[in-house]
Regions:
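Conserved phosphate/ATP/ADP-binding segment of small-molecule kinases
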Residues: 117-191
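N-terminal basic/disordered segments at the start of proteins
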Residues: 14-30
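Charged C-terminal helix
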Residues: 52, 226-266
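Phosphate-handling active-site elements
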Residues: 29-33, 192, 218-232
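Short pre-catalytic strand/loop immediately N-terminal to key active-site residues, enriched for Gly-Thr
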Residues: 7-13, 191-205
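Conserved N-terminal subdomain of the carbohydrate kinase-like
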Residues: 3-6, 26-109
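Short, small-residue alpha-helix embedded
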Residues: 19, 142-143, 201-225
């Protein structure tokens, strides 16, 4: 069985973060492991508290994983400090980690920045050059490229800049801001559009975590990047189409929509 590691924060409500990652990896047929960067008290209406892991303990978690069950792919999500980013980069380099997917969680849904400037600098200098693919949304792509994005051509220009600057492939997510469910993959000097069907579901908590984890899962199984993105988009469409409706805010998706078996039924 192939294996995958998520390095990210914990979401107490189960819709995003490592909880979404573990569900996604399991649903996509790989054995999931986690190294937690922070504990959060949150639900579908917002975040009420954050308790950050120490750099030393994060390093211990990564050591414990790589010295026993080596991951075939690594997904990196929310990392809130330059110190934690430094530990992740150091450990992944030392263990020669493969198939690294970076979801650069930098901007909240409200538009406010989630990372201090020193953490953004550490992310761009230490993690992005190690990534096989980075998966920014529009606001994150604007920060990474230093450009303003208003249309598909802007997505292509920004993705090209990010790819050339950091030496990685870039999946620029259009979301609801540009082309609904259309995403652009820029790799090896050219772009490829992945067109998706717009699903009218207001419950989208954890979509970014889920997409990046699904990509990592498929890379772990040996699929190339194009196929991994295509399969990941199909998976997240299934999650959204299941129309799970929980909580009082933007609720979670049903990561296990395709789960079948004698223990699933009521």
């Amino acid at each position: 069985m192939k294996t995958a590691l998520t390095i990210a924060g914990s979401d107490s409500s189960g819709g995003a973060g490592i909880q979404a990652d573990i569900k996604t990896m399991t649903a996509n047929g790989v054995f999931a492991m986690s190294a937690i960067t922070a504990l959060t008290a949150q639900n579908t209406t917002g975040v009420t508290g954050i308790f950050e892991t120490t750099p030393e303990f994060l390093g211990q978690q990564i050591d414990a994983i790589f010295t026993d069950i080596r991951p075939d792919a690594v997904k990196i999500g929310m990392v809130s400090s330059a110190e934690l980013i430094g530990v992740i980069a150091e450990k992944l380099r030392a263990y020669r980690a493969e198939h690294i997917v970076v979801d650069p969680v930098m901007v909240a849904t409200s538009g406010s920045k989630l990372l201090r400037d020193d953490a953004v600098q550490a992310l761009t200098e230490k993690l992005l050059p190690m990534a096989e693919v980075v998966t920014p949304n529009i606001p994150e792509a604007e920060i990474l490229s230093g450009m303003t994005i208003t249309d598909a051509a802007g997505m292509e220009a920004a993705a090209k800049v990010i790819s050339e600057k950091y030496g990685c492939s870039v999946l620029c997510k259009g979301g609801h801001q540009i082309n609904d469910a259309d995403d652009l993959l820029w790799r090896n000097g050219s772009g490829k559009w992945f067109h998706g069907k717009r699903i009218a579901n207001p419950n989208t908590h954890g979509t970014g975590c889920t997409l990046s984890s699904a990509i990592a899962s498929n890379l772990a199984k040996g699929y190339d990047l194009d196929t991994s993105v295509e399969r990941a988009k199909a998976y997240i469409s299934g999650c959204l189409s299941a129309m799970l409706d929980l909580g009082h805010g933007s609720g979670p998706m049903n990561h296990m929509f395709a789960l079948k078996g004698e223990f699933v039924g009521e």
